[in-house]
Amino acid sequence: MRQPPDGEGSVQVEMDPALHIETAKVFAIYGKGGIGKSTTSSNLSAAFSKLGKRVVQIGCDPKHDSTFTLTKRLVPTVIDVLQAVHFHTEELRVEDFVYEGYNGVMCVEAGGPPAGTGCGGYVVGQTVKLLKEHHILEDADVVVFDVLGDVVCGGFATPLQHAERALVVAANDFDSIFAANRIAAAIQAKAKNYDVRLGGIIANRSVATDQIERFNARSGMRTLAHFPDLDVIRRSRLCKSTLFEMEPSPELAAVQQEYLRLAEALWEGVEPLTATPLIDREIFDLLGFD
């Protein structure tokens, strides 16, 4: 009996080797639900585009709201358009599922199966297959996967099979760090069989990062960027805008520069991490819980 790729007991959606993304730098962004992954992903994509890179952002959440600050609307999902043509992919055109957003960022929403049915990994796989068939990924410099919540099951871990670096968005609180630790463990498991490696933590919605840094020191993780809890960031979502389109202010300029700095660092290449995720009890003890 063949051993599952990620160890005994795992249930995985395995990648077709033909779907490997050869030329672009690929990043998968994870984090606790509601932590601001879509805001982070969209502004990071915008920052890459500001550096002159050709960017594709793929939303991997049934809510399909990953790219709406880039496109100013909720675009149809890949699963929606596939259902409309009864899964006859030859009937689809690029413009049916790829939408140009802010500063030329190409936006795709994979969507997901109805609640309680199907597999999100299948949908992500079909999305990548369509993009490959229509040569969208061949023309990209950067691909950003924005992945559902902190779900790292075999299905929603599928983007890790394509990614070069996995990034974790976290706030300076227990729940975020607990989720980040679990995600790091899942990424380490994938790294045994795929090219993906941990890149680090993006601190978000946090005045300070002291708890994140305590976790980093213990686990071997690192903070790549820090975005404070600013009202302008919240308002940008309400305005359906990236941070690069908001009314100028000194605090906004600082956040924009941090996104540009992060994009440049990721493009130049961040060293892979070999972190040591903590057991659950250690997280409680580390952050001061009895």
Curated annotation (Swiss-Prot):
Pfam families: Fer4_NifH
Enzyme class, UniProt record, top EC level: oxidoreductase
Top-level taxonomic group: Bacteria
Transmembrane spans: none
Gene3D superfamilies assigned: P-loop containing nucleotide triphosphate hydrolases
GO molecular-function term, one example from the UniProt record: 4 iron, 4 sulfur cluster binding
Cofactor note as given: Binds 1 [4Fe-4S] cluster per dimer.
Reaction catalysed by this enzyme: chlorophyllide a + oxidized 2[4Fe-4S]-[ferredoxin] + 2 ADP + 2 phosphate = protochlorophyllide a + reduced 2[4Fe-4S]-[ferredoxin] + 2 ATP + 2 H2O
Binding site for [4Fe-4S] cluster: C119, C153
UniProt-annotated binding residues for Mg(2+): S38
UniProt entry tagged with the keyword Nucleotide-binding: yes
Binding site for ATP: G34, I35, G36, K37, S38, T39, K63, N204, R205, P228, D229, L230
EC identifiers of the protein: 1.3.7.7
Zinc among keywords: no
Leader sequence residues: none
Listed InterPro entries: NifH/chlL_CS, NifH/frxC, P-loop_NTPase, Protochlorophyllide_ATP-bd
GO BP annotations, alphabetical order: light-independent bacteriochlorophyll biosynthetic process; photosynthesis, dark reaction
Pathway: Porphyrin-containing compound metabolism; bacteriochlorophyll biosynthesis (light-independent)
HAMAP family (alphabetical): ChlL_BchL
Subunit structure: Homodimer. Protochlorophyllide reductase is composed of three subunits; BchL, BchN and BchB.
Protein's job: Component of the dark-operative protochlorophyllide reductase (DPOR) that uses Mg-ATP and reduced ferredoxin to reduce ring D of protochlorophyllide (Pchlide) to form chlorophyllide a (Chlide). This reaction is light-independent. The L component serves as a unique electron donor to the NB-component of the complex, and binds Mg-ATP.
Protein name: Light-independent protochlorophyllide reductase iron-sulfur ATP-binding protein
Organism the protein comes from: Rhodospirillum rubrum
